[in-house]
UniProtKB/Swiss-Prot annotation:
Expressed from the S segment by a leaky scanning mechanism. The keyword Metal-binding does not apply. GO terms for biological process: symbiont-mediated suppression of host innate immune response. Belongs to the hantavirus NS-S protein family. Antagonizes host type-I IFN signaling pathway. The lineage of its organism: Viruses, Riboviria, Orthornavirae, Negarnaviricota, Polyploviricotina. Keywords: Host cytoplasm, Host-virus interaction, Inhibition of host innate immune response by virus, Inhibition of host RLR pathway by virus, Viral immunoevasion. This is Non-structural protein NS-S. It comes from the Viruses. It comes from Puumala virus (strain Bank vole/Russia/CG1820/1984).
């Protein structure tokens, strides 16, 4: 097997794509009727202590984590909920 088959092409999308770290807040997550999880995100315009802040490089990682936790409905708005969730993710 050639090594060229294992390495991505120099012009591939994967190499051109760069991670952008954006401060996001997960405001709601729930399951749809087809058992697919739906997440509601928003970009933080300002940092407050009343919101759960997270650095999210992509939604797929957190989707998988929340699915493994058995999440079916979550609304994060109060500080105590945010702290509970933050502790469970550690």
């Amino acid at each position: 097997m050639s090594n060229n088959l294992l390495l991505p092409d120099k012009n591939s999308r994967m190499q051109r794509e760069q991670w952008k770290w954006t401060r996001m807040t997960l405001t709601r997550a729930h399951y749809k009727q087809d058992n697919k999880q739906c997440q509601h995100w928003r970009i933080n315009s300002q940092t407050t202590r009343e919101e759960w802040q997270m650095l999210c490089p992509g939604r797929k990682w957190i989707l998988n984590l929340l699915t493994r936790l058995g999440l079916n409905l979550m609304i994060i708005s109060r500080r105590d909920q945010a702290l509970d969730m933050e502790m469970s993710l550690m």
